[in-house]
Amino acid sequence: MTNPKVHFVVSLAINDGKLAQFQSVAQEMIAGTVKEAGALGYEWFLSADRKRCRLVETYVDPDAVLAHMSGPVVRNLVPKMLETASLSSFEVYGDPGAEAGKTLAGIGAEIFPFWHGLKG
């Protein structure tokens, strides 16, 4: 059984005094990602103390992952985001493809290939 979807779970620690800037950049990232045909989900979750964030991303297939990673959101806005928060962990669920997989591994993402489950 295969599943072409790829999911990211990105954990961020928001820098002290940077919440408003963090939220502003997140809004820009959402506005850019919504324009990507292969993006199925791009959801942000804040902890109760508003110091930690989880970003859950879902892409239709590895080509959509590569398009996102080489697109303007990642190129232009991720550097701005990293001025407001530090990356705590980055997990990838599914096969991101060879090129994107190499880039993701290079930034410390842990990749979990699809093993088994419901299709869809």
What are these regions (language model features)?
Residues F45-R50, L82-T84:
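A short beta-turn/loop motif at secondary-structure boundaries
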Residues A26:
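Short amphipathic alpha-helical/adjacent loop interface patches that line ligand
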Residues M1, Y42-F45:
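Short beta-strand/turn micro-motifs at beta-sheet edges
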Residues A13-Q23:
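Short, surface-exposed ligand-recognition loops at beta-strand->loop->(often short) alpha-helix junctions
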Residues V6-L12:
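Active-site-flanking beta-strand signature of metal-NTP-handling nucleotidyl enzymes
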Residues M1-P4, G117-G120:
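Basic/polar N-terminal segments that are highly enriched at the extreme N-terminus
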Residues V34-L40, T58-G117:
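An amphipathic, aromatic/His-enriched active-site/gating alpha helix that lines ligand/cofactor pockets
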